[in-house]
């Protein structure tokens, strides 16, 4: 495992190499001034990751949620390490959101509360135009620059396979021709449990995080319209 050092870390690597915790809500004024640069490119992540690569000698690197804290600069270090050591290593990325095609990662404009796909196809300037990150022009500009920078670098071409948790997510990722030949839909795993027969009941189940971009508001409106139908909500948020 390689990632950011933080209190919740429950796995690790043999040489204890991690990046520093980035607290976007705290820290000194000086550290906050450097965050915009660090969220786009992280030299520290490359240095620390190289230590793990040299020690572990992986055949496959499986990436998750690397934007902003670790940054895609990790991909460049993996590629560099492979070239310098003549070691073959595949790069697999599991997409947990739409970050690589939408700078605010939700495909939803938090200001208009509407689903939005304006950035699909690499038109990331729309993120700044819509103030899509926390309603802030400055933060949205940083998000736009991060997306444009890595598009310009062409770094994502080194990803061999991109795992999407649904066919819907796959269809959105495929809007980028670079990803279209690399995506596969694979649902998140669940623990196997013994099936037990229960009394059949008619109801509509929402299972997931209570978050606006998931359409929870629309479902609540439907609940009001269909008061004779039982709706069950299971999740947190």
Place the predicted regions along the sequence by residue.
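N-terminal strand-loop element at the rim of the active site
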Residues: 1-43, 47-56, 237
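Carbohydrate-associated surface elements
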Residues: 5, 168, 189
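Short N-terminal targeting/anchoring amphipathic segment
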Residues: 51-70, 89-94
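A short beta-strand/loop micro-motif in the catalytic core of glycosyltransferases
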Residues: 92, 157-167
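Membrane-proximal helix-turn-helix segments that form the acceptor-binding/catalytic region
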Residues: 99, 111-161
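Conserved donor-binding/catalytic core segment of Leloir-type glycosyltransferases
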Residues: 163, 196-214, 219-226, 232
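Acidic anion/phosphate-binding donor-loop and adjacent secondary structure
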Residues: 174-175, 180-202
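Short donor-sugar binding/catalytic loops of nucleotide-sugar-dependent glycosyltransferases
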Residues: 189, 207-211, 237
